[in-house]
Amino acid sequence: MKKLLWIIMILSLVVGCGQSYEETKRINRAQRLKALREDSAALKVAVLPTLDCLPIYLAEDHQLFDTAVDIRLKLFTAQMDIDTALANHRVEVGVSDLVRVERLKKQGDSLRYLTSTNAYWQLVSNRNARILDLKHLDDKMLAMTRYSVTDLLGDLAVDSAKLKSERVFRIQINDVNVRLKMLENNEMDALILTEPQAAVARKLKHKVLLDTRKLDMQMGVIVSQWKGMDGEARAKQLRAFTRGYNKACDSINHYGLANYASLIEKYCHVKRDALAQISKDLTFHRIALPREEDVAKAKAWLSKK
């Protein structure tokens, strides 16, 4: 009799545990589906650890986006990964440059410009490589990303120095953090960087050979999808994004870049002492479409590729 009671108790425990395990699986599955639905409905914004994204980071951290609207940041370290996310509709908004966007549009991706940004790019030479002028890039390695503003800038450098294109070895390094690390480790002769990575390079006494600002090129942009964005819910999200972005730009311009050093350090992973290398006059403009002449430059360069 006692043996029978033990068997019944053990069976009860097994059945109970089985039900508990199945119930846990069901709850976890339901939670995952709920999270996926919420993420799908949210406005997902792809960003990089670069200074042009500062208004977005500020709006997120300081709750300048309407809290009634679900806006989520998706962090990337390479522009190509943002391109893939945009092409696969895994994000609705992304930070990019005109060359990359015009190429995506040429390939059939349905994108529209939300705004230009204050991003600028610099061609920086490794001080140990003794590259004092663009002509010294002959037989040197240049880190960049193909079909981007960095690729365009590489061509401009080669053409202006009257070098043979095949004599400058373009090395595709997509991750902006890896690109800077290669300079710090003396693994690359020259690189094309934006802020704040360029500021780190300047602090380390590496030489700037080319700057898009001096070429009157404003190539940074933020884009959104065309398809699936015509509903009222998406329109409301974009309006909230625009208002939050504009507020963030106004705040940075009012208080100054130094006031947000901790935010830059948090998202861009650079030490704040490098920020002293960035001009105090740097401003962030409100939402405004890119200039037609800059779009034309991107299209003209792509037409030759």
Write out the residue ranges for each language-model feature:
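Ligand-binding clefts/hinges and TM-proximal coupling segments of bilobed small-molecule sensing domains
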Residues: 19-26, 69, 148-169, 240-279
